[in-house]
Regions:
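A transmembrane-helix-recognition feature enriched in membrane-embedded lipid enzymes
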Residues: 58-81, 246-265
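Juxtamembrane "helix exit" motif at the C-terminal ends of alpha-helical transmembrane segments
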Residues: 75-83, 103-127, 203-225, 234, ...
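Membrane interface segments of multi-pass transport proteins and intramembrane proteases
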Residues: 84-89, 118-135, 214-224, 243-253, ...
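Multi-pass alpha-helical transmembrane bundle typical of ion/small-solute transporters
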Residues: 53, 66, 73-94, 120, ...
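Divalent-cation
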Residues: 1-78
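Select subsegments of transmembrane alpha-helices in polytopic membrane proteins
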Residues: 95-111, 192-203
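Polar-ligand-bearing catalytic/cofactor-coordination segments
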Residues: 2-11, 15-21, 25, 35, ...
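Small-residue-enriched core segments of transmembrane alpha-helices in multipass membrane transport
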Residues: 133-144, 223-237
Length: 296
């Protein structure tokens, strides 16, 4: 039975004045220094799923991928801040861990605790658990959109959003088997189905349905139950994103369409010098042509 050969995934992340790209077994962060030169940090990356193959199973792999992406992303941000001149030295592993803990606490407080706290003040729906969870999900989504809109008002984040667009355009060029030139990259869409923006939006939607089965206990129990179920929600969202990256089915396209629209907020059209940085990062991680494909 013939199996379809597909191009191996390359993912990425916009950082301060640069782009991080992650390919099979390697990660590279390219940053434009104040002097104008491009500096690159490249390192081999081994996933925990290589040691424990059971973690490659659907839904489990999503939790692993999310954790590893956060760790690698924080390291890339630390390097980019130093290279771009915003910081004198990179963060240590302990500083990265502390930053991740603080960021997690902030996310739990704003996107989990606050919405479920606000809902209790809405009259007329307190006896309908389904409606309560639906309203909570809508509030969570509104807070998320306000957060994205708010940070997008700052000049520094606007430049990050431009690099985000450059990252997507460059990955599109790679996936289309086109030469990685500024001209080719510039012509591609700045939206991408496997973007983290899509992932976060799908998390918001999936959480509404998952949390609906929890009933409506007291505030503390609601917060704890939602935190404990986030790996489940993330695992489901990851599988949806993974499917979206490989399927042309109209139903799948419909699911990810809202996330693509949302990317108009989280990406900007990049300048040519920003595209050059994204190209440099991808060139460092792209697998050789002999190993660029895998069987579906």
């Amino acid at each position: 039975m013939n199996r379809e050969r597909i191009k191996k995934f390359v993912g990425g992340q916009a950082v301060i004045e640069g782009v991080m790209m992650r390919g099979p077994g390697v990660t590279a962060t390219a940053v434009r220094e104040p002097a104008g030169t491009i500096v690159v940090q490249k390192e081999a990356t081994k996933s925990i799923v290589d040691t424990y193959p059971i973690l490659k199973k659907p839904f489990l792999r999503g939790c692993v991928a999310l954790y590893e992406s956060l760790v690698i992303g924080m390291k890339a941000l630390s390097f980019s801040a130093k290279a771009a001149g915003d910081e004198e030295e990179e963060m240590s592993n302990s500083e990265i861990a502390i930053t991740m803990v603080i960021s997690t606490i902030f996310a739990i407080a704003v996107f989990l605790a606050l919405p479920t706290f606000i809902v209790k003040f809405i009259p007329g729906v307190q006896d309908n658990h389904i409606v309560l969870n639906l309203i909570e999900g809508v509030i969570r989504l509104v807070l998320f959109l306000l957060y994205i809109w708010g940070i997008g008002l700052t000049k520094d984040i606007q430049r990050v959003f431009q690099y985000h667009g450059a990252e997507h355009k460059t990955i599109h060029t790679y996936e289309l088997d086109l030469p990685l030139t500024v001209e080719n990259v510039r012509q591609q869409s700045r939206l991408h189905a496997r973007c983290g923006t899509n992932f976060l939006l799908i998390v918001m939607v999936v959480s509404i349905f998952v949390f609906a089965f929890l009933g409506w206990p007291n505030l503390l129990e609601r917060i704890v139950s939602r935190v404990l179920l986030m790996p489940v929600v993330a695992g489901i969202a990851y599988e949806v994103i993974r499917l979206a990256g490989r399927s042309e089915h109209s139903f799948v396209k419909a699911i990810i369409k809202p996330g693509l629209v949302l990317q108009y907020m989280t990406t900007r059209e990049p300048e040519d010098d920003q595209i050059e940085v994204a190209i440099r990062a991808l060139e460092e991680v792209r697998p050789p042509e002999s190993d660029a494909y895998e069987e579906e």
